[in-house]
Amino acid sequence: MEKIWLKNYPNDIPAEVDVHAFASLKHVLQRSCERFADLPAYGNMGESISYTQLDRLSRDFAAYLQKSLGLRRGDRVAIMMPNLLQYPVALFGVLRAGMVVVNVNPQYTVPELEHQLRDSGAAAILVLENFAHTLQQVLEKHPELKIRVITTQVGDMFPALKALLTNLAVKYVKKMVPAWRIADVTEFKDALRAGRGQALEDVALQHEDIAFLQYTGGTTGVAKGAVLTHGNMVANVQQLAAWIAHDLLDGKETLLCPLPLYHVYALTCSLVFMKIGAHNVLITNPRDMDAFIEELGKHRFTAMIGVNTLYRALLDAPGFARVDLHSLKIANAGGMAVQRIVAQRWKAVTGVPIVEAYGLTETSPGAISNPLSIEDWTGNIGMPIPSTQAAVLDEEGNETAIGEVGEICVRGPQVMAGYWNRPDETEKVFTSDGWLRTGDMGFMDERGHFKITDRKKDMIIVSGFKVFPNQIEDVVALHPDVEEVAAVGAHDERSGEVVKIIVVRKTLALTEQALLAHCRLHLTDYKLPKIIEFRTEPLPKTNLGKILRRELRDAPKREPQEARAAAATA
């Protein structure tokens, strides 16, 4: 296949990168700790640890896992917490010990946590005690699970007095720690102390060794563990580092990371910035907008990552306009489509465009991105990054013509080895010649830029015509009185499906008729919403901030006064 996008590559970005420059993520970490020893590596809540401290602390945790717990190469170790300084210490400790990281969403319910621990076969788990009660219920239900438990408190990486005050406030003032009781628990601080006095066995890791079991698909069925090897992750770090190299300087950058490290988007971005010696500032709870904005004011951050809903929330926050953004070079977005109105507002306020990128858990996750040189919202996801192939295939597996919609498929060294213990599911997502089926519908233009029209499963079919929810949502979001919107398909006897929109208004003055009039200016008749439902509460989202269309689509019908067929006469 012809890589037509290479004709439009920025001059400073190579077509291929050396994906074999490092044998493993352990080697990436070691090199950064040597090069940037005294620079801050990770920061959180006003405290930070240097690369030297990250090296020492992760070594101690690795030694504890090997010697005190007796875990072996390839054993799975779960990490269940929000963004805290303990996270990178534990993560790199697990990898240095030759073991596999299983990132766990701390908001998981008992059944969700139960599934992930049993499916992964986790031998140990590090959990923030705020969520230990959930783990307790899983262990009580399944006494056969022999999982070693390490607990930590929010302030465990802070100086002694601040740690004491923080932990007391979290537990007794804010009452954020439900009662829990688990036998034979080790505290994180004790684990580090134990490891400090023990020798670390050097594990010779290679590209084929598994680094992460990254669970995905929980919103559409039973979550599956994507097997991400050290080779996958090293490749993606190298690819993305090459993509940003022209704009960023080694040892001089500060990344604002408000997205959780247990999500692969934030995880890999953090690894990329760790490679170049940046200061990774971790935000524990970006939903606390006042505290978030206060934290923004403390740093001269040069790069940030986010999703559409986060950027919009910042723009709507009263204090954001006072934040000094003169040092910002890059605002990257992924996880969901960036709406035109959000991108335009962000550029107007900050002077920096939102650079939209695309990937999946199964691609570690980076696969396609807009170049950093864009000046405004492009409406597409950009070009394949170095050493990556992308194509649009029809249902028979043939490449579509330029501009013709099909399924976006990807090949490259960052593509997962498969799903953990799911050969049947693995077979479903790969073509016979090695393409990963992304499940996203889209097309490639004559410049080699890709545009997503929508998720294959989210597509709405109206009388045989394909309607893409992203387009509907983008149009509705342009209305100044719309806070949030989701478009889904609703059953209809005549047309099979009709477009339904669920809207959160900024003001009750917004009527169905006004919204329909707005839509008619931008949408052809069959794309017009035939059902408009107004809600007062925020729309359901993943922890990354992505609206859960499936949950809205499957929700029981509301009472007539809450959901009306407003467009019946359209």
Show the residue positions of the predicted features.
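AMP-dependent adenylate-forming
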Residues: 3-7, 27-50
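Structural core segment of the AMP-binding/adenylate-forming
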Residues: 96-193, 507-508
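Gly/Ser/Thr-rich phosphate-binding loop
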Residues: 149, 164-168, 298-305, 315-376, ...
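Conserved beta-loop-beta connector loops within the AMP-binding
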Residues: 358, 377, 391-409, 428, ...
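Conserved adenylate-forming
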Residues: 68-72, 195-208, 213-256, 268, ...
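Conserved AMP-binding/adenylate-forming core of the ANL superfamily
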Residues: 21, 38-72, 78-84, 88-92, ...
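Conserved AMP-binding/adenylation subdomain of ANL enzymes
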Residues: 234-254, 264-302, 317
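AMP-binding/adenylate-forming catalytic core of the ANL superfamily
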Residues: 87, 108, 115, 125-131, ...
